[in-house]
C-alpha cells in the first residue's frame, strides 16, 4: 500500500512537470524497512504500478536499487528517491543487460533494469543498478563467501559498463552495501587492493535476498557524447 502511494504521488509530480514515469525517470532508490520481510510486498506493488505506466518486459523498466532503509517514523515501511530528466528523448537512452553474466530481472519476478546509459551532446551517463553476485540464470554465486561474491559483483558491473563503452575507471561514485558489519574490513581490503582508484563508500544495509552478502551500485560518466542530442 505504501509503495503504491509513493509511486502515485511521484507520478503526479512528474505530470506537473510535463514528464512521465516511463519517459523521464531514469533511476530509483527504494529503501525498505526490514527488507527480508517487506521486500516482496514492494516488488508486487511496483509491478502493479508499472503496468499502468506502460513499464513492462515488452517495453522497459527503470534502473533501481532496492535495499534496507529506515525512516524516523517506524510506521513508514518504504521510502524512495528518484532521478528524472525533462526534455530527454528515447533515442538517448539505452538499457544494459550483459546476458552472458546476468539474466533479465523479470525472469525472477522483479521489475527493474540492470543499467541505463543516457547519451547527451557532450557526454554519457551510466547508471548501474544495485548489482550482486548473480549469474545468467538468476542464481546466487558463491553463497556464504563475501569476498568471492564481491569479485563476481565487480565482474558483473564491468560487463554492464562495457555495453555502454565504459569501464570501472569511469565510475564517479559507488555505494557498496553489506549485510553484516563483520564483513566491512574484508570487503574494504579487497576493494582497496584490487580497485584502488574506485571512489566508493561502504554502507551497512542488507540486500533484498538473504544469500547476497554484498551489493554495489554506481554512476559512471564518459566523454562519449552524440551531437544529435542536447547537452542538458
Regions found by a protein language model. Name each.
Residues 1-173, 177-232:
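N-terminal presequence-like segments and the immediate start of the first folded domain
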